[in-house]
Amino acid sequence: MPGMTRQGGQVWAHVGQAFRETAYDVVVVGAGRMGSACALFLRQLAPDVRLLLVERGGLPNEEGATILAPGVWTALDVPAGREREAAWVRRALAHDFGNVTFGPRPLLDLHAEEGEGRLPSADLLAQFPEAAGLFDPAALPFARVDLEAATYRPGAVALACGQRAVRAGADLLLNTHAHLTPGGVRLDRLTVTNTHQIVTHETHELHAGLVVVAMGADGPHAAEHELGLHTTHGRAYRQLPRLNTPSTDHTPTLRAGGLILRPQHGGFTLVPPIHHRDPHGYRPTGGRLTGVPVGVRRETLEDLLRLMAALPPLATEALEVGHSLADVPGAWLALPEGRADTPPCHQHLTEGVHLLLGGPLADPLGLAVAYDLAARVAGVGERPWA
């Protein structure tokens, strides 16, 4: 029998659990942060809707861009007019999803030139002594400060949303590759052979009144190749190198030249800027440093080299660049409208199909966009941030 929560949502975790369903009101494809949140909000807003959440992995946060998302909430990244949504997301992260390691952590946005709202960076070292040695005040003499910035674990948010959606009555089908079809989805239930190959064990055709495509960077590609629906969205492959310079719970998040130094696990996770969409057919590959192969892609390597004088720890052995691509964590990231500065969005593609995308600004705005789509599907006009 399928696993069942106390309140009725069923979970199919492996092919040994028979799946006999043939139709749902709503199928959400992809249980990352955006898909899991949308499923949860829809169950809360429309509890009579039969909903299935489908995930290729074995957990709602097992793989993809969500597990590698920076988890940095900052008002500095929020487009004008979206401030209330971002504030609602911050409150939700702090109170609504249990332990997602949410915590206030000021962000110092460092600059070489003076500008509106920027303070002398050297003066900030008295307030943030943990930042001493992380940047050169002579090279980056100005900074904007977001005292309300915070950090959290997006993967934990996705897992919490998935679990709560099931407790609220949603069904969850794991280890399943979903293909978009007219009027529904085709489900390939996956299993692993004794030679460690992932193969299709069985296939099901499922009718759905509405399909929410929350497949991250794979979503636009699936819409085009499986339904013939062209979109303007793109994707980029982002790596997150490790910097083993010590950090503490009091170390602020730093950003310079678009590069984020996110304190994590006693060191730093580096979040490089995304300059443009990757071309169709691009395959991630490591670059070369003075002729030596490294795991960091060339574009990211150039960003790190450019900032080494301003951020001295980058020029030390604390920076891990790896020997091959497999040494550096990375994932494909959706780019709404093909741009790195476009906020998350949802889009009606055709009758019965909606596309839901997070992207680079999912940390401060993703949950609000997922809620907005759920409310539209449920026919609810009010928004909690309005």
Model-based region annotation:
Residues M1-V26, Q44-V49:
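Extreme N-terminal leader/targeting segments of oxidoreductases
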Residues G30-M34, R56:
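Glycine-rich Rossmann-fold phosphate-binding loop(s) that bind the pyrophosphate
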Residues A37, E63, T74, R91, ...:
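Flavin-dependent oxidoreductases
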Residues Q44-A65:
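Glycine-rich FAD pyrophosphate-binding loop
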Residues A69-D136, G258-I260:
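Dinucleotide-binding Rossmann-like beta1-alpha1 core, especially the glycine-rich loop
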Residues V100-D109, G115, A126-A168, E351, ...:
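Helix-loop-beta segment of a Rossmann-like dinucleotide-binding subdomain
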Residues V145-L206:
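Helical element adjacent to the flavin cofactor pocket in flavoenzyme catalytic cores
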Residues A309-A386:
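C-terminal catalytic lobe of FAD-dependent flavoproteins
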